[in-house]
Amino acid sequence: MREILHIQGGQCGNQIGSKFWEVVCDEHGIDPTGRYVGTSDLQLERVNVYYNEASCGRFVPRAVLMDLEPGTMDSVRTGPYGQIFRPDNFVFGQSGAGNNWAKGHYTEGAELIDSVLDVVRKEAENCDCLQGFQVCHSLGGGTGSGMGTLLISKIREEYPDRMMLTFSVFPSPKVSDTVVEPYNATLSVHQLVENADECMVLDNEALYDICFRTLKLTTPSFGDLNHLISATMSGVTCCLRFPGQLNSDLRKLAVNLIPFPRLHFFMVGFAPLTSRGSQQYRALTVPELTQQMWDAKNMMCAADPRHGRYLTASAMFRGKMSTKEVDEQMINVQNKNSSYFVEWIPNNVKSSVCDIPPRGLSMASTFIGNSTSIQEMFRRVSEQFTAMFRRKAFLHWYTGEGMDEMEFTEAESNMNDLVSEYQQYQDATADEEAEYEDEEAIQDE
């Protein structure tokens, strides 16, 4: 079956990742020791997308866990599902990357990368027909960003025809963890533009807002944020794991969402978001789900889709519902908000339906949109980057690990190019495209 190999790196990646496994284990009825305790055959039908069945009938996640310090791994190991992972798949160093991208990418990370690749290879060989990789990491730190992007480029070399999907936590505008985040994030985006196929963009601030505003949590913890992320991650892949009427896989997703190869950074959303207490009292309808799913407040990254236009979007519904109703709602959204969709890609919203809803809900939906407004986020990081780089602040930490200033300049201009590409397609109209083709034709003559 079409397996997905999951890789988590750094503190953030390991925390999101372990939460994700809790959700997926729950959906497939697998207990913390890896035994199946579920009730429905559907849970087992495609369990091998994410799990390898060991000889004793236990299910072991196809997961590789890496970090440059042992701390987070220890807490994953002692966490609720810590015993389910294959012990050899924990790969960690002792030194830490100290929020330094260069340490993760060039020095400390480079020393550890071969051991990680060995584990990845071993897991990939266990697969019947590997579909691709999903990587969880943050871009603000050292390990997830530096070593994460190093691993992505190495995997790209070795498995060029497999999909590479990332769940990347971007530094958020107001909540800053370290002062060098803009450097780390810009250097990472430079890599992701070239080596990843699809990036799901998340950021803590947007997640805080959702917890605070929609879920009415007064003091949201990282656990709450990660819970939101894992709901989305599980939604993105539910089509692969459960039977449905309209299925999609990582590659179909990419084909439908990426009109130009570099523009593969997606906003994600999830519905229904209700506070934990009030969940059981209301029946959901497809129109309500659709309404909430397209709501700007529901997006998990700090960019406002109303400031740009959707190039493409994909909606994944879960639960028993009529496909006809889903299609009608989707057409309805596009007709009502036609100015927010580029007119030169007709029918640019794809929907899929999977029959099994997440635990505790009768239906749910996951939204993935390729919107030009995501440039706001790159712009923001880029401005912070430039402010520091102009003064060469903190650069010695990077050059000391053998990096060259040139690399910073390249990363900066790559990010700025990305922003202007988004802008170009935001402004493009169907007529302009035609004019442009005429010009080309004239030049060719």
Swiss-Prot record:
Cofactor (UniProt): Mg(2+)
Residues noted as binding GTP in the record, renumbered to the chain: 11, 69, 138, 142-144, 204, 226
GO cellular component: cytoplasm; microtubule
InterPro entries linked to this entry: Beta-tubulin_BS, Beta_tubulin, Tub_FtsZ_C, Tubulin, Tubulin/FtsZ-like_C, Tubulin/FtsZ_2-layer-sand-dom, Tubulin/FtsZ_GTPase_sf, Tubulin_C
Binding site for Mg(2+): 69
One Pfam family linked to the record: Tubulin_C
Record key words, sorted: Cytoplasm, Cytoskeleton, GTP-binding, Magnesium, Metal-binding, Microtubule, Nucleotide-binding
Compartments in which it is found: Cytoplasm, Cytoskeleton
Lipoprotein among keywords: no
GO BP of this protein: microtubule cytoskeleton organization; mitotic cell cycle
SUPFAM superfamilies (UniProt xref): Tubulin C-terminal domain-like, Tubulin nucleotide-binding domain-like
Key word Transport present: no
Residue spans of biased composition, Acidic residues class: 429-445
Entry function: Tubulin is the major constituent of microtubules, a cylinder consisting of laterally associated linear protofilaments composed of alpha- and beta-tubulin heterodimers. Microtubules grow by the addition of GTP-tubulin dimers to the microtubule end, where a stabilizing cap forms. Below the cap, tubulin dimers are in GDP-bound state, owing to GTPase activity of alpha-tubulin.
Subunit architecture: Dimer of alpha and beta chains. A typical microtubule is a hollow water-filled tube with an outer diameter of 25 nm and an inner diameter of 15 nM. Alpha-beta heterodimers associate head-to-tail to form protofilaments running lengthwise along the microtubule wall with the beta-tubulin subunit facing the microtubule plus end conferring a structural polarity. Microtubules usually have 13 protofilaments but different protofilament numbers can be found in some organisms and specialized cells.
Protein name: Tubulin beta-5 chain
Organism, scientific name: Zea mays
